[in-house]
């Protein structure tokens, strides 16, 4: 894990994060009848036609299927590396996996959203469009991810990459809703993001006394797999859909025979997604300790056995991205990812470093999050690239694209985004009002099962901490293979009276050390750096530092 950190202060419109894992989502289900799901679930009719008969009509289709780009706009070769701004490897690894998700990338490169977006404040779709466009159009270079991507989430230390990933996906889903806020919740599941990543669970309970059947459905955007007793992803999926007996104290209260009776409960995938996000539950929700074991995962995965209907043909998915955590705890270590470019070549994306890899190396990792896409979808996007232009052959400069953080220059061409992208980033970073933020917080209460660790210390009155870690224990020792960060912030934390300070930079570390003794008896507070007050400028030695504004009381 990187030693030094940067707190990205400021408000973000998508400030509430609810983790959307769905390994056993039964507690969140609302029991409904078979006829209460949409008649045309966004993804089911293409892959599981026989499932559509049980579903009810949608009040409004927010993102019709025909609006998804049918042809690929992605460059065939791999794109840019991402600069680590201090403890942001989890951000970079997650963004690379999303950047190389074909349906999402193609939609972003079409720029259809920015042409119709009427929001005047932060929009995650606009921000992601700008990022993906820059990343894919700057191969061989290193770019700085927009601070708006992590605003309201990053607190200057290691965070959970899966939490950030789903925070971003959920924010993009919410960005599809302006202008459609009065629609029913089924129609909300027809958004562009749900069409790409979403599907439906079916929880079926069968009373063993009267043989009555109750079906409950719930949408999902990712699937969490328990790996404690599993040696492979297939075994974890089998355990997930294994029937459960309800008897004794757990007997089922049947709504048909109106009595408590033994029952059988089964959880299956009712509709499949274009893109599957499978998260391997490697971290304890209480301590954050890691399950350090190898779990095998295939390059091609047939999901037919885990569907509600198994009497049709294979439903094959192919692997296109892997998010990896190196370390023994969620509080330390390092995140990186492997992605499959549209030309078919695998690459390791390790912050600024981009190197060619092989499928053998990809399948040998201790994966944390796996990304699969339907084989038919991948082939369709790959064929469109072949028709458009021939993939560029790997040359010597492509085989090992290494651009370290020390090689970045202030006038590096890749740091200059296209004119449209700059406009989008500027619009996305505008802050929402405090009243609006409070309203959203009231409307989106944190789920009870989401354990939020209380933040000690005092924050400036104009700073809002949107996301807090779910883990209760504090930070542990750093991973021995720590990364060096661009920003060397002092370990000194401001006192209650100095909590309005924006931060201490590397160039002022001496001053911070001299004042450390004066503050050692004061209550510790979080170090807060406002991103907007930092400016990029070179030092005499060629390294990069940042000008800032600091106020003392």
Curated annotation (Swiss-Prot):
Catalytic residues (UniProt): 89, 334
Catalysed reaction equations from the record: Thiol-dependent hydrolysis of ester, thioester, amide, peptide and isopeptide bonds formed by the C-terminal Gly of ubiquitin (a 76-residue protein attached to proteins as an intracellular targeting signal)
Family annotation (InterPro entries): HABP4_PAIRBP1-bd, Papain-like_cys_pep_sf, Peptidase_C19, Peptidase_C19_UCH, USP_CS, USP_dom
Protein name per the record: Ubiquitin carboxyl-terminal hydrolase 17-like protein 15
GO biological process assignments: protein deubiquitination; proteolysis; regulation of apoptotic process; regulation of protein stability
Record's compositionally biased regions (Polar residues): 496-505
Stretches for region Disordered: 382-413, 491-524
A Pfam family this chain is assigned to: UCH
């Amino acid at each position: 894990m990187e030693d030094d950190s940067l707190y990205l202060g400021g408000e973000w419109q998508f400030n509430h994060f609810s983790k959307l894992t769905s390994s056993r989502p039964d507690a969140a289900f609302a029991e409904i009848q078979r006829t209460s799901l949409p008649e045309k679930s966004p993804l089911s009719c293409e892959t599981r036609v026989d499932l559509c008969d049980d579903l009810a009509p949608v009040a409004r289709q927010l993102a019709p299927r025909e609006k998804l780009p049918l042809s690929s706009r992605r460059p065939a070769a791999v794109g840019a590396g991402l600069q680590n701004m201090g403890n942001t490897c989890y951000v970079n690894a997650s963004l690379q996996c999303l950047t190389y998700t074909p349906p999402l990338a193609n939609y972003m490169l079409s720029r259809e959203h920015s042409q119709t977006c009427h929001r005047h404040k932060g929009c995650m779709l606009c921000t992601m469009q700008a990022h993906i466009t820059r990343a894919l159009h700057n191969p061989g270079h290193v770019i700085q991810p927009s601070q708006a991507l992590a605003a309201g989430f990053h607190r200057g230390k290691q965070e959970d990459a899966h939490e950030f990933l789903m925070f971003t996906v959920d924010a993009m889903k919410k960005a599809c809703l302006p202008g459609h806020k009065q629609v029913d919740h089924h129609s909300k599941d027809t958004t562009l993001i749900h069409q790409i990543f979403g599907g439906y669970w079916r929880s079926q309970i069968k009373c063993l006394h009267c043989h009555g059947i109750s079906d409950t459905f719930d949408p999902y955007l990712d699937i969490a797999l328990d790996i404690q007793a599993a040696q492979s992803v297939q075994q974890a999926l089998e355990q997930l859909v294994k029937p459960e007996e309800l008897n004794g104290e757990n007997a089922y209260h049947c709504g048909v025979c109106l009595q408590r009776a033994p029952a059988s409960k089964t959880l299956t995938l009712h509709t499949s997604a274009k893109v599957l996000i499978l998260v391997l539950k490697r971290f304890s929700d209480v301590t954050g300790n890691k399950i350090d074991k190898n779990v095998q995962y295939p390059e091609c995965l047939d999901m037919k056995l885990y569907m509600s209907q198994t009497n049709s043909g294979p439903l094959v998915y192919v692997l296109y991205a892997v998010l990896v955590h190196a370390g023994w705890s969620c509080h330390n270590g390092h995140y990186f990812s492997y992605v499959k470019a549209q030309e078919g070549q695998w690459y390791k994306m390790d912050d600024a470093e981009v190197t060619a890899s092989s499928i053998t190396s990809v399948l040998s990792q201790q994966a944390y999050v796996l990304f699969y896409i339907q084989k038919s979808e991948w082939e369709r996007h790959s064929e469109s690239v072949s028709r458009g232009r021939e993939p560029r052959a790997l040359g010597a400069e492509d085989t090992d694209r290494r651009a370290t953080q020390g090689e970045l220059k202030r006038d590096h061409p890749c740091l200059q985004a296209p004119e449209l992208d700059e406009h989008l980033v500027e619009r996305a970073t505008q802050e929402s009002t405090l009243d609006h933020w409070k309203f959203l917080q009231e409307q989106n209460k944190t789920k009870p099962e989401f354990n939020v660790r209380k933040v000690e210390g005092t924050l400036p009155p104009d700073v809002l901490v949107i996301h807090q870690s779910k883990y209760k224990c504090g930070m542990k020792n750093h991973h021995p293979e720590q990364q060096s960060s661009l920003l060397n912030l002092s370990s000194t934390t401001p006192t209650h009276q100095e909590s309005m300070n924006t931060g201490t930079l590397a160039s002022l570390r001496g001053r911070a050390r001299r004042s450390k003794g004066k503050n050692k008896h004061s209550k510790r507070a979080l170090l807060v750096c406002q991103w907007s007050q930092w400016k990029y400028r070179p030092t005499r030695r060629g390294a990069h530092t940042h000008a800032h504004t600091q106020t003392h009381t």
